Amino acid sequence: MSFEDLEDMYGAEHINPTLDPLDGSLRPPVIKKITAAPERGNMTALIPEITGRDIVYSIGHTEATYEEASAAVASGATMITHLFNAMRPLHHRNPGVFGVLGIAESLPRPYFGIIADGIHLHPTSIKIAFNSHPDGFILVTDAMHLVGCPDGVYDWTNGERIIKNGTRLTLAGTDGKIAGRWVHSFP
């Protein structure tokens, strides 16, 4: 993967600074954050180019090992999207992405988003994450476009369908794979 591939994916006009037509100054890219798996393609090598455009690179949707996640942080990744979700689980011999929250190898510790909705994570997992790096802890929702819709089955991306049942969203045809959460706000 190259930066040109990212330009094709996101649109060059959205991922690069542009000139303001009124005063000729450089405007930052429209895209402010990219979440990607650092072990895929050539992504870790692209992190400095991404962050050099004032775009936050967030580790997520990943099978990255601790070493791969550490390399991403060393290259400029400053965030983890939805810690513990859609990523390699914590293992005692390879802590995966979670391991970069510890103080090691003089790397900065990234911020991390946690979905604390009672469905995505066990409360103890949330406490462990918070206690590992309280200054990096960010509460996020996994709210989706179905907010306010009645219970039912809805079309999603790539021909998949989502089942909305109360506040729980699951992917149709699976054994309850979490697809998101519907919430008004935190209590």
Predicted regions: what they are:
Residues 1-95, 148:
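Histidine/acidic-residue-rich, glycine-tolerant segments that coordinate divalent metal ions
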Residues 46-50, 59, 68-187:
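Active-site-adjacent C-terminal substructures of enzyme catalytic domains
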